[in-house]
Amino acid sequence: MSEQTILFAFPGQGAQYPGIGQDLFEAYESVRHTYEEASDTLGYDIATLSFSDPDQAINLTRFTQPVLVTHHVACMRLFNELTGNRIQPGFAAGHSLGEYSALLAAGAIDFKQALSMVSARGELMGEYGQGEMEALTLEYADARALADEFYCGVAALNLTDQTVVGGLAEDLQALSEAMQQRFPRKRSTRLKTEGAFHTYYMVEAAKRFRAVLDANEFAEPAISVCSNYSGEFHDSTASSIRSRLFLQLFNPVLWVNNLNHVVDQGVNLIIEFGGGIGKGESAAEKRPNLEGIVKKTFRRHESPPEHMAVINRETLENTISRLA
């Protein structure tokens, strides 16, 4: 195939599901080693939590975040192993939590650091965060106007016409009712989260998380990594990376900006690692979390980037075959 400029991408919270990673765990020894390493770092059995979870603890933020990072890394490592490390990214990006996996992919942090940081991050977000989140099929300006009116905040710009807001449940309800009156053809969907992530309702969690960031060393990334906070690339200094990860907790995830920025830099292939969404229960029935956003973002682009994924055995085999 023609020369590719590649982005490694990692989804965020909401891409977890009971049984995540089990198909690859059972098939590949290297994946089992990744899960063992994660369990040793975290102090609990991440495989059991991921595969057999009758209490749905996987949906608690303090567990969701390490579960997803473990799956991100297991998928990426396996892909690298089976391709002989010949498919190298020029850039890395992650949505919210996924930004930590992107920094790992770039060599700025290692796996143990990523797990320790996101474990603390998830625990603090779950304990000190407030509120809920709502996805609106509105452009930023309209969503921001509604959020300002009802004591809410913009949490993410996923598409030009999909903006996520966060606030207290009663404020989101008032916002949703006002939206239905003013934009009757638009939709809103309540998201299942433990708080209004990426809004001012996360300030207390961020203040406490700063100590975790300050205690970690960050190496200069080997490739450019997108910052959700700025919408562009991280600076290479440790102090700047720490600061932007701190600010990311209570500011919007500028995901559509990240995607446009990397394509402006020449990215023509996006490979998504980990997670999965869809109503089916098994890993084989899941689809990539970010694929729809990528396709919608660039549907009118003259040269839209290709999207591939490694989230289960089928996508792993398909992606490797397409890149052969």
Model regions: which residues?
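Acyltransferase
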Residues: 185-281, 285-292, 296-300, 314-319
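Generic, ordered loop/turn and secondary-structure boundary motif
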Residues: 21, 25-26, 47, 59, ...
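Short, contiguous clusters of charged residues that form electrostatic/catalytic patches at enzyme active sites
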Residues: 70-77, 116, 170, 207, ...
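Bulky hydrophobic/aromatic packing residues
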Residues: 21-22, 36, 47, 148, ...
